[in-house]
Structures are given as C-alpha cells and as structure tokens.
Amino acid sequence: MSYGIYIGRNLTADGVAYLAGYGDEPSSHWLEINPRQAHAEGSTITVGVTPQADMPGVLTEIPQAAETLRNMRVSYSYYLGVPAPLTNGGLNECGVAVRDHWRTSRKELIEMTPTDQTGPHYSDLARLVVDRAP
C-alpha cells in the first residue's frame, strides 16, 4: 500500500508546498541523486511489468529523452514482477515533485485488463516525471 500527503503552498505559513509519502514495499530503499544527463539519439528505456506481476504485462521500450533533468529520488529494490530499481518519488531541478501511488482496481477493471498489457507502470511514471518534467 502507498500513502501520499500533499500540502499546498497556500496552506503553509512559509508558502512552501510539501509532498511526502510512504510505501510498505518489502525491500531496500535508498536515495539517488542524479545529474542532468544527455542521451544518444535513438536511446530507449525499458518500462512495464513482467508476466509475474499481480496484473501481468510485457516489458517494452520507449524513447529516452534527449536530456534528463538533475533530480533526487527514492528508489527501492523489489516488487513482484516489476524490474528494479523502482522509483517511489522525488524532486527535480525545476521544482517538480512526484510520488508514486499504487492502489488496486475494481474487480471488473482487473478482469478486463489484458495479460499482455504494455506501457509505463506507476513507478515508471514517477521516474519519467522527475527525469523529464520542466
């Protein structure tokens, strides 16, 4: 289960927004500090989940951005069927913050999800935001 707390800048005495979160994944967590990086034209990154995930899927490649932003994020090492490292959330040099959230879906939505689904999962989306969002 994941939890997140957001307090907007209009609700704090100092005008600073706060974003916090907690995830109870059964794995190691660590802080990463990543520099701004240039990537070769045609580079890709792997996203998605494996057939072992609770909601199975297929790993796929998507284009890597030409440049990713300097950021710090919390990563973790394990969630069944999701390749490590996973991103809990973070903050980039532009002040964009993100926190991943996982929640189960309604039974009928789970049943209609194909077992060969592709595309970014919740942790991939958090990583993409801290890497790319200006």
Question: Whereabouts are the PLM-identified features?
Answer:
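A contiguous strand-loop segment
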Residues: S2-S123
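A conserved hydrophobic secondary-structure block that centers on an alpha-helix together
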Residues: G119-P134
